[in-house]
Amino acid sequence: MAKPLSISSSDTQSQPLQWRAYYEMTKPKVVALMLLTVLVGMCLALPGAVPLQPLIFGLLGIGMMAGAAAAFNHLIDRRIDGLMARTYNRPLPKGRVSITKALTFSISLAVLGFVLLYTLVNELTAWLTFASLLGYAVVYTAYLKRATPQNIVVGGLAGAMPPLLGWTSVTGEFHGNALLLVIIIFAWTPPHFWALAIHRKAEYAKVDIPMLPVTHGTEFTKTCILLYTILLAIACLLPVLVGMCGPLYLVGSTLLSCGFIYKSWELKFDDKPGLAMQVFRFSIYHLMLLFIVLLVDHYLWV
C-alpha cells in the first residue's frame, strides 16, 4: 500500500530560506544606502517635486542593477569569501545557492533593471547604470581588487555614480552639480574601505588580496585615511561654493567632516583596539547623514 504524501518541515522551510539567500546576495543594506544617494540626486536636480515615473522606476531599476552587481560580486569572490571570517557564511561558499543559479539570478536581475530604466526612465540612465555595474562587477571585483593596492581608489568611481544616476533619471542629461556629488562619494570611499581593511588585514593577506594595509602596512594606511578624510571635507564644501546648497548643509557637513577627521586622527595616533571598525562604522553614518542634510537643505533653501 502506498504511503500517504507528506511534506517535511525542512521542505516547507527550504523555499523561504532559498529566497533569503538570493536576497542576501544583493547586499540590501549597501543598496539601500546607495539608493538614498540616488534619491538625493533626483531631488537636487529639480526645484520642485520629482515626477512619479522616474522616481519609482528609476529607484527600482537602479536598485535592481545594483543588486545584480552585488550578486556578481558574490559569484566572482566565492572562493576567497569561503576563506574569510567576514564572508564565509555567504550563500555561495555555504552552498545555499549553486553557481549556475547565482549566475542566472545575477543576469536576470541586471537585464530586468536595464530594460526598466531604458523603457520607463531614459536611455542615458540605463547605459550609465550598466557602465557602473561593469565597473564594479568586472573592472573592480574581477581585476582591480586582485591587481593593485589602489583598487579602492580606482574602482571607487563605479560606486560613486549613484547621485549622477539619480540626476539623469529626472533630467536625461549631465550636469556639473551632479558630478560634485560623485566627487564626494569618490573621496569618501577609500577611508571607508581602508578602515575595514585594517581590521581585516590578516584575512586579506591570507587570500592574497593586495589591500593597502597588506602591501604598505597599517601605519601608512592610517595616514592615508586621515589625508583622505581631509580631502573629503574639502569635497563636501564644493556644493556650497557653487551655490548648490545653503547654510544648513554648510553647518551639517562641517560638523560631520570634523567628526570624521577626529575619528581618523584618533585612529592614526591612538593605539586603542577597535578604532578601525569605529572609523568604518562612522563613515557609513557620515555618508547617510550628509545626504539627508543635503536633501533637507535643498527644500529649505529652495
Curated annotation (Swiss-Prot):
Top-rank taxon: Bacteria
Cell location: Cell inner membrane
Keywords: Cell inner membrane, Cell membrane, Heme biosynthesis, Membrane, Transferase, Transmembrane, Transmembrane helix
Residues passing through the membrane, by range: 30-50, 52-72, 102-122, 124-144, 152-172, 178-198, 224-244, 245-265, 282-302
Entry protein name: Protoheme IX farnesyltransferase 1
Record keyword Cell membrane present: yes
MF terms (GO), sorted A to Z: protoheme IX farnesyltransferase activity
CDD domains reported in the protein's UniProt record: PT_UbiA_Cox10
Family as reported in the entry's similarity comment: Belongs to the UbiA prenyltransferase family. Protoheme IX farnesyltransferase subfamily.
